[in-house]
Amino acid sequence: MEDSMDMDMSPLRPQNYLFGCELKADKDYHFKVDNDENEHQLSLRTVSLGAGAKDELHIVEAEAMNYEGSPIKVTLATLKMSVQPTVSLGGFEITPPVVLRLKCGSGPVHISGQHLVAVEEDAESEDEEEEDVKLLSISGKRSAPGGGSKVPQKKVKLAADEDDDDDDEEDDDEDDDDDDFDDEEAEEKAPVKKSIRDTPAKNAQKSNQNGKDSKPSSTPRSKGQESFKKQEKTPKTPKGPSSVEDIKAKMQASIEKGGSLPKVEAKFINYVKNCFRMTDQEAIQDLWQWRKSL
C-alpha cells in the first residue's frame, strides 16, 4: 500500500511563465490549454488602461467554469482614465479555459499575470536515477571484501545497540567482582604481614611446646584464591530474549530515528529472530500484527 501511495503522489515541479494580453471593444482573449496531464492555472495581477484609451468607463469581464462545471461571468475591474487607470488584482487565480473581454469601453486594456504549470517529473529522469542507483549498488558489492554481509545496515545497527547494552551490563558485573576481590585481597594481606613480623624465636618456642614443627597459616590466602577461582569458573547466565513490549519500544525508537521495518512477513520474522533472539512463535505473530498496524 505504501508503494502505491508513492506512485500516486509523484513529485511535481512547478513552472511559472509570464502572461499578458490586450483587450479592445472588438477583441476578446481566449486562454486555453491542450489536453495534457499537467495542471495549468492563470494568476492575474494587474489590469490597466492603455496609452490611447479614452476617458470613459471600461469594464473588464472574465468567463470561466464554476465548481459545477457551468460557465460563469465575473467582473474583474472597472477603469476610467481620469479616476482609476489601473487595478491590482493581487493574484486572481482562474483555471482554464478562460475568456477575457472588454464588456464596456473601447480600450485598449492591458492585463498581466502569470501562467502556472505543475509539471510531473519525467519518466526518463526517474529511469536514469534508478540506473544510477543500480550502478552504485553493483560497484559497492564489487568493492566489498569477502562478498560483504547480506544483513541490512539497520538490522546490524539494532543488533549493535543490543550488544552494547549487554557489554555495559557485563562491565558493571566485572567491576563489582573486582571490588569484591580487592576487599578479600586486602583482608588476606593483613594476617600475612602479622606472620612475617613473628620472630623465629616465637616459632621455635611454639614448636618446642607442641613437640612438632609449626607451619605458617595459609588459610586466608588459600580461601581468597579458591573464591577467585570459583568466580572465574562460574559461568554467567546468558541474557534471555527481550519481552514483546521491549521489542516494540526498540522498533518504535528505530522508526522515529528514520529507520524502517521489513514489510514482508518472512523477512520480518527473520529480523526479529536475529536481532532480538525471539523464538516464541506467538510473540512473533503478535509483533507482526503490530507491524502491520503501523
Curated annotation (Swiss-Prot):
Effect of residue 248 to A: Partial destabilization of the structure
Presence of the UniProt keyword Acetylation in the record: yes
Start and end residues of each stretch annotated as Required for interaction with SENP3: 1-186
SUPFAM superfamilies for the chain: Nucleoplasmin-like core domain (SSF69203)
Cystine pairs: none
Gene3D superfamilies found in the cross-reference section: 1.10.10.2100, Nucleoplasmin core domain (2.60.120.340)
ADP-ribosylserine modifications at: 207
Compositionally biased tracts (Acidic residues): 120-132, 161-187
Protein modification: Acetylated at C-terminal lysine residues, thereby increasing affinity to histones. ADP-ribosylated.
Residue segments, region Disordered: 120-247
Effect seen on changing residue 288 to A: Complete destabilization of the structure
Residue ranges of the region described as Interaction with NOP2: 187-215
Pfam family, one: Nucleoplasmin
Modified residues (N-acetylmethionine): 1
Effect of residue 4 to A: Abolishes phosphorylation by PLK2 and impairs centriole duplication
GO biological process, one term: positive regulation of NF-kappaB transcription factor activity
GO molecular function, one term: protein homodimerization activity
Residue numbers of N6-succinyllysine PTMs: 267
Family membership noted in the UniProt record: Belongs to the nucleoplasmin family.
Protein name per Swiss-Prot or TrEMBL: Nucleophosmin
Organism, as annotated: Homo sapiens (Human)
